[in-house]
């Protein structure tokens, strides 16, 4: 009777495929179905649904196991509850690192592994009770869930010690070795480009011994003690031997942060690991603290490598045996860090070990990382350094934000840089009190004797206080030093004690600039010179205290120092012109620089006059330049505004540049501006910024025949402008700076509306200016219109009670003649009792009751 063996037997040139098409054993039509086949079919359906998860994760699944049950053609009577399946281990059975258990009926993925199995007859099925069968099934299911290399035994299996004989004999080092055998070879290839580290060659020998071990027959089961003893020697775990430690798997990626085998709390007995494996030399690749996984272990518990602390090999084998239940996400909290990432500021959250597989925070020292030392960091070498700016005790300008929690599943895809650790620290970093930092005795007491073996250029030997590179672990990239010219930015430059020009600074974002800036803030910056910050003038110019320091030094410094500062400023002049603090340094150079320096700075403005004129700080630089540069250069700069005059006039910053051009450039040189104002004077006079420009034109160009049209347009609309909140200033300016003819024309224009305008909030100011700057004729017209023809006229009483008109009446008392004053007093005396009831009328009555000596004499007459 032709039947088909449940085990798929491949030839030497065939591959084990991961396809599910051949995963279910096929039976002949003559054999009736049994429960085992049903179970396998259901399991196949379930595994099909879960298979997409494995494919999406793109993780290599090395390993297979084939259940062998009673042969369907066997004449033995079939039992409804079949016996536990018989598993025949291969020489290497790999497991899924993420799931940590075998799944039945799953073949190798892209593995060329010829398996030679004998065609012997299956052993006779021995009927067992349901209790015994369930116990055996439970044992196998428990071993199914164990991590690492899992080999199941059956009564028909031979000694398992030979299964590793070929592999252990080929090499004794913990590395992959390539076999010299001409037999089959298994090339474990990547399924995804993201796992380039996994493309290692694994050699599996296949010889006649393996064929004999895989033969199916009625061989006598070896003694259990023999099996266990040989499994100990090969570190192969089987059912009932999970308590023995497994041999670590070399060459497969570890998926656990910070290489937790370094933590002594993971080893039973609490052995002190602090003195083992400390690398004080240059740390190589794969040993890092704030980095990404570089190596992955085959165990379920993921481990990242720690900062340069490698445990002895004697702990390596026993480490994973005492690990708690596996966690398939990354523990982002390193046991070598003093505060976790969700701690904030100086308040450390020491999280105890609540979750299984997560170590508690130990007091393992942290190797200094150059992620936070700019001259040693990875970005300078072109690599990606993952870390962040640390929270220095002295860098308290801007508190760092809370970093986002990373997704541990994606840590394996991050790139790590080579050799991130740096055992030494920057020199002279202190967190001591300010009063003791400069004390030599205190420094010697804290630092201790120097160590010549650790001396390196620009590096110190000891820390004291808080180590600068120790803090929370963050996932964002560190910032790089550039021209930090944004408002409120705090640049960081290195030390100030013993600075030397050009090259004495170790880095540009160290903590020692804080000390320097604090010295400047406290008023102790006079002991420093510009030569102390040579090479970092731009960074200091963008700081509030640094900018003030440079400005003070530029006023009295030597020409050589000023030239050195100018050479650094000139390439970054355009950026500093728009900086909140840097613009003052540029203005100071325009003011105290020589003619050559002024000309070179003015050349930097060419082509950027319009955008700088519209910028808050750039407009100040242009105004200063127009004050000090040569006349021909002023004209060249002003001509860039042609076509943009009205835009600048209506801008809150640009109008100042237009005013400065009007002040410093002759009218015949800026004819394009006057042409732009023609027909727009009235509207510009009522604009909040345009009214300033019109007033500046009246000051500088009112007597020029080219500017006559400005006055004419103002006089034509003087009544409207007098009532406008901005136009009234233009009208007042004409009364102050204009000619007598212009004042007379304004008086005639306003005649007939004096009382109405005197009660207006803005026009009342114009009437006061008419009384103050107008001639006798204009004043007489105003007084007659207010006083009226006789005493029955009530306009004066109404003005005295008004909040704006009473000021016009008081101005009349100040500017009128004696005869006019007597006439007004006689009118006021008639309404004195009524005026005392009003707030504004009281001022008029009090003035009436305290007349001058001349007035009293005239009143007595």
Curated annotation (Swiss-Prot):
Positions carrying Phosphoserine are 159
What S-S linkages are listed for this chain?
none
Signal peptide bounds: none
InterPro entries noted in UniProt: ARM-like, ARM-type_fold, PUM-HD, Pumilio_RNA-bd, Pumilio_RNA-bd_rpt
What is the predominant subcellular site recorded for this chain?
plastid
Pumilio repeats: which residues?
Answer: 532-567, 568-603, 604-639, 640-675, 676-712, 713-748, 749-784, 791-826
Give every PUM-HD domain span.
Answer: 512-852
> What biological-process terms (Gene Ontology) are attached?
regulation of translation
> Cellular component GO terms, alphabetically?
chloroplast; endoplasmic reticulum
Q: GO MF terms on file?
A: mRNA binding
- Spell out the Polar residues composition-biased ranges: 10-31, 105-122, 134-143, 168-197, 224-238
Q: Region Disordered: what ranges?
A: 1-34, 105-199, 213-261, 426-454
What the entry lists under SUPFAM superfamilies is as follows: ARM repeat
The record's subcellular locations are: Plastid, Chloroplast; Cytoplasm
Any notes on this protein's domains? The pumilio repeats mediate the association with RNA by packing together to form a right-handed superhelix that approximates a half donut. The number as well as the specific sequence of the repeats determine the specificity for target mRNAs.
> What does this protein's UniProt record list under function?
Sequence-specific RNA-binding protein that regulates translation and mRNA stability by binding the 3'-UTR of target mRNAs. Binds the APUM-binding elements (APBEs) in the 3'-UTR mRNA sequence of CLV1, PNH, WUS and FAS2.
The name on file for this protein is Pumilio homolog 6, chloroplastic
Organism in which the protein naturally occurs: Arabidopsis thaliana
């Amino acid at each position: 009777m032709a039947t088909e063996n449940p085990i798929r037997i491949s030839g030497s040139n065939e591959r084990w495929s991961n396809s599910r098409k051949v995963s279910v054993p096929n039976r002949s039509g003559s054999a009736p179905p049994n429960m085992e086949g049903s179970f396998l079919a259901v399991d196949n359906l379930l595994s099909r649904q879960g298979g997409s998860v494995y494919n999406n994760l793109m993780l290599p699944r090395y390993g297979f196991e084939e259940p062998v049950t009673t042969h369907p053609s066997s004449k033995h009577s079939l039992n409804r509850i079949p016996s536990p399946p018989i598993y025949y281990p291969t020489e290497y059975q790999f497991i899924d690192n993420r799931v940590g258990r075998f799944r039945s009926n799953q073949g190798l993925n892209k593995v060329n592994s010829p398996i030679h199995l004998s065609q012997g007859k299956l052993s006779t099925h021995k009927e067992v009770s349901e209790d015994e069968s369930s116990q055996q099934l439970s044992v196998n299911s428990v071993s199914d869930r164990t991590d690492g290399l899992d080999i199941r035994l059956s009564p028909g299996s031979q000694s398992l010690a030979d299964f590793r004989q070929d592999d252990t004999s080929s090499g004794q080092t913990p590395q992959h070795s390539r076999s010299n055998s001409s037999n089959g070879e298994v090339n474990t290839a990547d399924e995804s480009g993201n796992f380039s580290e996994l493309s290692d060659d694994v050699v599996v020998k296949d010889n006649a011994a393996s064929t004999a071990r895989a033969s199916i027959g009625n061989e006598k089961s070896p003694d259990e003690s023999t099996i266990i003893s040989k499994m100990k020697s090969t570190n192969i775990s089987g059912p009932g031997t999970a308590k023995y430690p497994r041999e670590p798997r070399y060459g497969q990626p570890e998926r656990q942060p910070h290489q937790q085998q370094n933590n002594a709390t993971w080893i039973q007995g609490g052995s002190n690991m602090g003195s083992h494996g400390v690398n004080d030399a240059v740390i190589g690749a794969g040993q890092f603290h704030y980095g990404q996984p570089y190596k992955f272990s085959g165990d379920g518990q993921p481990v990242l490598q720690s900062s340069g602390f490698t445990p002895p090999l004697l702990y390596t084998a026993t480490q994973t045996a005492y690990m708690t239940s596996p966690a398939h996400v990354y523990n982002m909290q390193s046991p070598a860090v003093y505060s976790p990432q969700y701690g904030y500021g100086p308040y450390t959250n020491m999280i105890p070990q609540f979750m299984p597989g997560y170590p508690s925070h130990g007091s393992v020292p942290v190797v200094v990382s150059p992620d936070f030392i700019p001259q040693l960091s990875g970005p300078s070498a072109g690599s990606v350094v993952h870390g962040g700016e640390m929270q220095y005790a002295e860098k308290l300008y801007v508190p760092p934000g809370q970093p986002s929690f990373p997704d541990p599943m994606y840590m394996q895809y991050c790139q790590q840089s080579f050799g991130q650790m740096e055992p030494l620290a920057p020199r002279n970093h202190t967190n001591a009190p300010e009063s003791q930092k400069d004390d030599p005795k205190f420094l010697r007491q804290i630092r201790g004797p120097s160590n010549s073996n650790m001396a390196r250029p620009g590096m110190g030997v000891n820390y004291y206080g808080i180590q600068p590179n120790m803090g929370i672990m963050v996932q964002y990239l560190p910032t790089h030093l550039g021209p930090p010219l944004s408002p409120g930015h705090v640049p960081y430059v290195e030390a100030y004690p013993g600075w030397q020009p050009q090259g004495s600074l170790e880095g540009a974002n160290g903590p020692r600039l804080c000390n320097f800036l604090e010295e400047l803030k406290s008023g102790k910056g006079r002991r420093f010179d510009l030569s102390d910050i040579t090479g970092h003038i731009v960074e200091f110019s963008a700081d509030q205290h640094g900018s003030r320091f440079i400005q003070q030094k530029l006023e009295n410094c030597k020409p050589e120092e000023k030239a050195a500062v100018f050479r650094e400023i000139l390439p970054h002049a355009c950026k500093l012109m728009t900086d909140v603090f840097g613009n003052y340094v540029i203005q100071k150079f325009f003011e105290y620089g020589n003619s050559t320096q002024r000309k070179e700075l003015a050349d930097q403005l060419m082509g950027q006059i319009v955008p700088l004129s519209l910028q808050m700080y750039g407009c100040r630089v242009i105004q200063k330049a127009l004050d000090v540069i040569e006349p021909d250069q002023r004209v060249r700069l002003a001509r860039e505004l042609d076509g943009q005059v009205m835009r600048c006039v209506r801008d809150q910053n640009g109008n100042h540049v237009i005013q400065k051009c009007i002040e410093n450039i002759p009218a015949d040189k800026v004819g394009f501006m006057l042409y732009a104002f023609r027909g727009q004077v009235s509207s510009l006079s009522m604009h909040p910024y345009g009214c300033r420009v019109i007033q500046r034109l009246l000051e500088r160009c009112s007597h020029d025949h080219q500017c006559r049209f400005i006055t004419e347009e103002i006089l034509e609309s003087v009544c409207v402008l007098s009532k406008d909140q901005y136009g009234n200033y233009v009208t007042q300016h004409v009364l102050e700076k204009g000619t007598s003819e212009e004042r007379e024309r304004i008086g005639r224009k306003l005649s007939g509306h004096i009382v109405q305008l005197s009660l207006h909030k803005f026009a009342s100011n114009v009437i006061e200016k008419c009384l103050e700057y107008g001639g006798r004729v204009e004043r007489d017209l105003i007084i007659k219109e207010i006083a009226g023809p006789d005493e029955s006229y009530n306009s004066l009483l109404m003005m005295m009670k008004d909040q704006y008109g009473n000021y016009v009446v008081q101005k009349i008392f100040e500017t009128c003649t004696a005869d006019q004053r007597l006439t007004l007093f006689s009118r006021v005396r008639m309404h004195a009792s009524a005026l005392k009831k009003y707030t504004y009328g009281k001022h008029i009555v009090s003035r009436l009751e305290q007349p001058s000596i001349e007035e009293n004499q005239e009143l007595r007459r």
